[in-house]
């Protein structure tokens, strides 16, 4: 399989992107990489060109570019060319650690939306206390959503959890302010009713935010505005907790001695809370796998994302979503233009 990679997107591009690519092709003999970006800069780090092809371009989308305008004006940007390769059948999937909004726009405008899917959804896998993790969507592709959209999000998340995360009959929950069916606003109440009355996936009811990391569900569905705030809250809380723990352990001689014995365990805890270890955030609802690697990804983060995309292609996640979208009868009412 061929995977198109934006070599110029992310905080540590192109170095960490290239190092991650080399690690992936060394591990997976069935993977070929199309690297889009500045050939001179890429070659500074690309020491092994086995199954790696560079497609040179001087143009790239910056982190502060306005997404839609950048995609339309920068036709030769590395991110856009990577998506175009997928559109033209030259690659099976694409990856970028660059501008999230631009990648979503590229996925929609260049690769295109799946017929019958009303809205795309951005879905990372977030950590849980056991290290199993859960898929959450939408985390920012849509600020607003309708009940029909959340119904479809449940289907897409369930397919991914089953195919890639290898969970038999994934538990799908709806994020709400209480577990009772009557709780919530108009969106969550109507979404609950739709999800309860479908048989395309295993809906287990509402989940409260405090239980997200407790392995209660395998897939959690919400609108993009709420989801993005939850993501930032988890990131901020995790960082604050580790910072406070570090300050406590370094306060006084006895604590420092204890910290030296706990160092390995604390590093393991930090790794468990790092959701980039699960790969990137999938843009579900488009015609091919499009995955957003974390902007600060190192080589291992890029490797993990390539491994994730390889699994998506191999397990035919997009093809399964296309085949099963009709099971969610209420959706598919909006234009695919």
Swiss-Prot record:
Signal peptide: none annotated. Gene3D superfamilies: Isopropylmalate Dehydrogenase (3.40.718.10). Pathway: Lipid metabolism; phospholipid metabolism. The keyword Cytoplasm applies. The keyword Transferase applies. Its EC number is 2.3.1.274. GO terms for biological process: fatty acid biosynthetic process; phospholipid biosynthetic process. It comes from the Bacteria. Keywords: Cytoplasm, Lipid biosynthesis, Lipid metabolism, Phospholipid biosynthesis, Phospholipid metabolism, Transferase. GO terms for cellular component: cytoplasm. It is found in: Cytoplasm. It catalyses: a fatty acyl-[ACP] + phosphate = an acyl phosphate + holo-[ACP]. One of its GO terms (molecular function) is phosphate:acyl-[acyl carrier protein] acyltransferase activity. InterPro entries: FA_synthesis, Phospholipid_synth_PlsX-like. Pfam families: FA_synthesis (PF02504). Homodimer. Probably interacts with PlsY. Catalyzes the reversible formation of acyl-phosphate (acyl-PO(4)) from acyl-[acyl-carrier-protein] (acyl-ACP). This enzyme utilizes acyl-ACP as fatty acyl donor, but not acyl-CoA. Belongs to the PlsX family. PANTHER family: FATTY ACID/PHOSPHOLIPID SYNTHESIS PROTEIN PLSX (PTHR30100), PHOSPHATE ACYLTRANSFERASE (PTHR30100:SF1). This is Phosphate acyltransferase.
């Amino acid at each position: 399989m061929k995977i198109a990679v934006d070599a110029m997107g992310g905080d540590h591009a192109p170095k960490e992107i290239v190092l991650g690519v080399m690690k992936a092709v060394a591990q997976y003999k069935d993977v070929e990489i199309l690297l889009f970006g500045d050939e001179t800069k890429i070659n500074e780090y690309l020491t092994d060109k086995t199954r790696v092809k560079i497609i040179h371009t001087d143009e790239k989308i910056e982190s502060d570019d306005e997404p839609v305008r950048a995609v339309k004006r920068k036709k030769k940007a590395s991110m856009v060319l990577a998506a175009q390769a997928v559109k033209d059948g030259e690659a099976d999937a694409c990856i970028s650690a660059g501008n999230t909004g631009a990648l979503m726009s590229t996925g929609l405008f260049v690769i295109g939306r799946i017929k019958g899917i009303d809205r795309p959804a951005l879905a990372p896998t977030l950590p849980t206390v056991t290290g199993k993790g859960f898929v959450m969507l939408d985390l920012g592709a849509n600020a607003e959503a309708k009940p029909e959209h959340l119904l479809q999000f449940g289907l897409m998340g369930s397919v991914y959890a089953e195919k890639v995360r290898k969970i038999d009959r994934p538990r799908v929950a709806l994020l709400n302010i209480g577990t009772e069916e009557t709780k919530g606003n108009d969106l969550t109440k109507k979404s609950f009713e739709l999800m309860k009355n479908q048989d395309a996936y295993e809906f287990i009811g509402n989940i409260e935010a405090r239980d997200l990391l407790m392995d209660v569900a395998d897939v959690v569905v919400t609108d993009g505005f709420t989801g993005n705030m939850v993501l930032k809250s988890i990131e901020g809380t995790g960082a604050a907790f580790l910072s406070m723990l570090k300050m406590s352990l370094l306060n006084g001689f006895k604590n420092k001695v204890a910290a030296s014995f706990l160092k390995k365990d604390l590093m393991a805890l930090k790794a468990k809370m790092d959701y980039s270890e699960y790969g990137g955030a999938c843009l579900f609802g488009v015609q091919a796998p499009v995955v957003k690697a974390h902007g600060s990804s190192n080589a291992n983060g890029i490797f993990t994302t390539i491994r994730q995309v390889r699994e998506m292609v191999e397990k035919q996640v997009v093809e399964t979503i296309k085949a099963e979208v009709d099971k969610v009868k209420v959706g598919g009412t909006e234009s695919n233009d």
